[in-house]
């Protein structure tokens, strides 16, 4: 009986920890993360204070923070080839990182770090030098900056069969030296690295290449981490938020269900299907059952996005900034729908798979510059600064904890729905106008469409909609309008 009680206690404790790791630790009613891909720490700190906090964003996913290999031309993916756990990259050093985390936390913006636990750098001719000046010999699996030696890695092998669990989890992903997370020593170094970031005030981690590590090894690592730092405004006993990169199209040998109890899981099918719909390959009317009805993970387990830094560079259904009208519609739907834990992308312009972030002649990352409307102009795309996107972050905050209701569609590519009695969204992806009286579910009054403009000094700078005492309003979205979406909410009432 004593053994049974102890086993039950340990089981419940483990379940409690894993449940806590699904909590993003947002501040107030904020509930949207933005990925400021390849931004410098000093620029993120300023963005938190001057843009993200005033517009209601909840958190920032940052690029990998630890020292990486220096690759010719400085492609973005060099950040995913670590050679030590020193906090020095092209985004800045440890002091600048710590300052950024503190300043962002001070204004209610949480920081989530993209962490590389699966591997170290791939092969390099001779001695490699990292962004902190550390030397390593990746071909010999020698990383003195940690230190790691060959005994800390799985034996070298290539992934040739993606249906072979051993290859997926113990061979080298695109040639990257595969760490043995079952080793007590490797586990200790990874835990030490993550705990240091927790001490500096981060709220959680995106775990890169999680499916290439055994779930039981990750469970041990996550369970060994410190609680979040209360000096940065986190409650006592708060656990780091974990979201794990697991690419699972529904027929994978290593499945998302192995990881979704440990933390949230990236729902890549969400990205593909929302792209299909707004590219016109699937009628929007089918989005009425969006979420688990499409075979996605449960909402609290699903980390969702229209695109990410990887798949935005692929050919296929995934939308990116290069299709701006469809991208804004898809993002508006994403932010208006209650499904999933949401991240929006903030990119830099690219022409190919290897394009580096905007940099100067000395290969230093440059700071974003802005025009009079606040949009980025010097190689940074900054989708999060597009009015149609940041306004929907405000919409999402306004409708938090309400249900989707009042669905309407025209049997094709015109849809609308309510979020309780606090918000309304309409989308027109047809080649003809949407002009109709629709139920907005809102209290009577005049509302600004936050897509086409803003509420400033009691007046709308864009479209407005008058809602009658029955909640109905006349909705018009022309087929040739600049934006194919209209959004109203109670905080934009005139």
From Swiss-Prot:
Cystine bridges: 48-104, 157-171, 376-382, 418-441, 448-460
The keyword Oxidoreductase appears for this protein: no
Binding-site positions, Ca(2+): 118, 169, 178, 212
Modification Pyrrolidone carboxylic acid occurs at: 21
Cofactor remark from the record: Binds 1 Ca(2+) ion per subunit.
Subcellular location(s) per record: Secreted
EC numbers on record: 3.2.1.1
GO cellular component: extracellular region
Amino acids binding chloride: 206, 308, 343
KW Nucleotide-binding (keyword) present: no
Keywords recorded for this protein, A-Z: Calcium, Carbohydrate metabolism, Chloride, Disulfide bond, Glycosidase, Hydrolase, Metal-binding, Pyrrolidone carboxylic acid, Secreted, Signal
Cofactor(s) of this protein: Ca(2+); chloride
Active site positions: 208 (nucleophile), 245 (proton donor)
Superkingdom of origin: Eukaryota
Signal peptide interval: 1-20
Pfam families: Alpha-amylase (PF00128), Alpha-amylase_C (PF02806)
Positions of the record's site feature: Transition state stabilizer: 310
GO terms assigned for molecular function: alpha-amylase activity; metal ion binding
Quaternary data: Monomer.
Family: Belongs to the glycosyl hydrolase 13 family.
Full protein name: Alpha-amylase-related protein
Source organism (scientific name): Drosophila bocqueti (Fruit fly)
Gene it is expressed from: Amyrel
